[in-house]
Amino acid sequence: MENSFAQSRPSNGCDKFEKMRKVAGVEPGELRSQLRASCAVVSPNLEGMPTQSAVSSLMVTISSNTNASVTCTISNVQANMICTPTYTDCTTVTTSICPTTPYDNGLPTPLSSLPNKPSKANCPFQAHDRTVNRKRKGVSQPPLPILTPSPSRKTKRQATMPLNEEASTSTAAALNNNRFALLSAEAENMEQDVSDADSDIEDSAARDGGGQSAKYSKPPAICVPSVSDPVTLERALNLSTGSSNYYIRISRFGVSRIYTANPDAFRTAVKELNKLNCQFWHHQLKEEKPYRVVLKGIHANVPSSQIEQAFSDHGYEVLNIYCPRKSDWKNIQVNEDDNEATKNFKTRQNLFYINLKQGPNVKESLKITRLGRYRVTVERATRRKELLQCQRCQIFGHSKNYCAQDPICGKCSGPHMTGFALCISDVCLCINCGGDHVSTDKSCPVRAEKAKKLKPRSRLPMTNNIATLKPPQRSSSGYIPAEALRTNISYADIARRNTTQSRARATVQAEVIPTSDNSLNNKFMTLDNSIRAINTRMDELFKLIHETVEANKAFRELVQVLITRIPK
């Protein structure tokens, strides 16, 4: 009997009975006692009798040679997950071991560990399908009819196994006397609740963007200049971000550019470089950049707190509000102090630049037409087209907010921040070109070269000039319209008429050309007179400047004489 049992029973039979026991949803001891009691009611002398265990796609039936039968109902889908085609094995039923009882009395594992159930570790980019295995809770479902799809139809569902007719007959007969039907219903409800909970958790994570399936932009490069020991840099990045989350490229200027795989690796690399006191610079992440809009149609003296509250009522978080100023020479305000007088000719404009926090619906803020009692217009702020220069290290291409290099003065190129209070030198020295001007001077040759590269290229489509060329049009002055078609005209009349028309055309051209020449001459004469008047005014201006310089020199000499004569 032992040999026949070893040959007829599959190697994974214990695992299958273990899974069927877990579907029942009860402890091993309770299930054993119930099965033992059911067997004892029908026949108390079942010990040592050979039994036959049949596993169908809908229920598990344990029957002996007598009339005693015990049936454990499971769902159709669970049977498809657990069972293979029906097999029969012979064993011995005793009062201590049941065929559906595992060899170990371990605690039941969660239902998420059953086969054919999606796992978060295996499928991190997919959520559970809520439409699968949806049943009414608390009601045991009857066997579903088998629907065979057509060969031409493409389906992703798993093919169901055909049911055995004999097993279906025995199942229908055993439904009336089944003592474990409630266990089957409770197991189905338990599995459905766990599946719904997992689906809700994954759906909420996907909506929040906190899972791995959330989309993110490509992080910018981290620029590290003057790297003398690249091995140490790689070792530090490997320990902090991981060797597979970054790569390095060297530019033609010798700057090491570190490209990371995701924003988390980017932030980790920046923190590590800051710990090492490394000099570097980078740009802001796209997810952290504010959404900048322009608010028009609102009074300039409206408090910023009121505007912030109005945007908060619409569901947007305001990060910063800025009201620009413009020059107003008509309304000059003079503020006189003890030793100096300053002129304030800038007034606030009736518009605000507002930085909003990034969000999924932040673009909907452009549809706002009313803030409080004001009828407003919200537009996307235009991007600044001028060349960006760092006010910390004076290098072009990044800002001081994301620069970790040593400060350099924009006036004397000293090792300090730009400021006349800290700068003791009177000589200007540009750090970029070495010229005698400040680093922010518009005439810097390095700045001019960088600005040329920023000019946008023409986006007009390339057209074929030969195909777009138009034929030359005749002047309207020499054009004579054709006459209506007439009959009974000889060839001599036509030739005579053509000769007359050519003579008339030559006469008209001779009369028109002198007129055009006279008009051009008059225009040139007017332009020449204007240029002469401008030259005269420029000469007068130069003389006035020269006299002013001479007077300034005389004034300085007079001051020096007065200083020398002052008694000490």
Swiss-Prot record:
Start-end of unnamed zinc fingers: 390-403, 403-423, 430-444
Pfam families linked to this entry: PRE_C2HC
Region described as Disordered: spans on this chain: 128-170, 189-218
Keyword vocabulary terms for this entry: Metal-binding, Transposable element, Zinc, Zinc-finger
Alphabetical list of InterPro entries matching this protein: Pre_C2HC_dom
Segments of this protein annotated with the region Three zinc-finger-like regions: 390-444
Biased composition (Acidic residues): 189-203
MF GO annotations: zinc ion binding
Stated role: Strongly basic protein that binds directly to retroviral RNA and may be involved in its packaging and in the reverse transcription process.
Record's protein name: Nucleic-acid-binding protein from mobile element jockey
Source organism (scientific name): Drosophila melanogaster (Fruit fly)
Gene that this sequence comes from: gag
